[in-house]
UniProtKB/Swiss-Prot annotation:
Belongs to the UPF0091 family. It holds the Pfam family PhaG_MnhG_YufB. This is UPF0091 protein PH1455. InterPro entries: PhaG_MnhG_YufB (IPR005133). It comes from the Archaea.
Length: 120
């Protein structure tokens, strides 16, 4: 085993830990908005580290550089699309009338909508 394989294995393990933390967040958070925020952040980081780790692991084991290139392309795509899709889902949930948790103290989107209505 060389250094790249070791780094790749560490990143895969690191990603697995973040997947576990995401699962805990889905269970522990009180409403859909907090759950989506927890899931998006930890799954994005977990997926990125796992994907890059697999690419480095494959490169360290003597496979072609194409493995690393493909995993980097996939990671960039995931980094760009995962937060955008989560934002879209949360916005759809808000517009559908799913209430915030009663412990939520700030609703900036509601304030934004009121300002937008007042400007028209």
């Amino acid at each position: 085993m060389n250094v790249l394989s070791g780094i790749g294995e560490f990143l895969v393990l690191f990603g697995t830990v973040f997947y576990f933390l995401s699962t805990l967040g889905l269970i522990r958070m009180p409403d859909v908005y907090n759950r989506m925020q927890t899931a998006t952040k930890s799954v994005t980081l977990g997926s990125l580290s796992t994907i890059i780790g697999v690419g480095l692991w494959a490169l360290g084991e003597g496979l072609s550089l194409a493995w690393l290139t493909k995993t980097i392309v996939i990671a960039v795509f995931l980094l760009l699309t995962n937060p955008i899709s989560a934002h879209t889902l949360i916005r759809g949930a808000y517009k559908s009338g799913i209430p915030l948790w009663e412990g939520s103290v700030v609703d900036k989107y509601k304030e934004h909508l009121k300002e937008k209505e007042g400007a028209e």
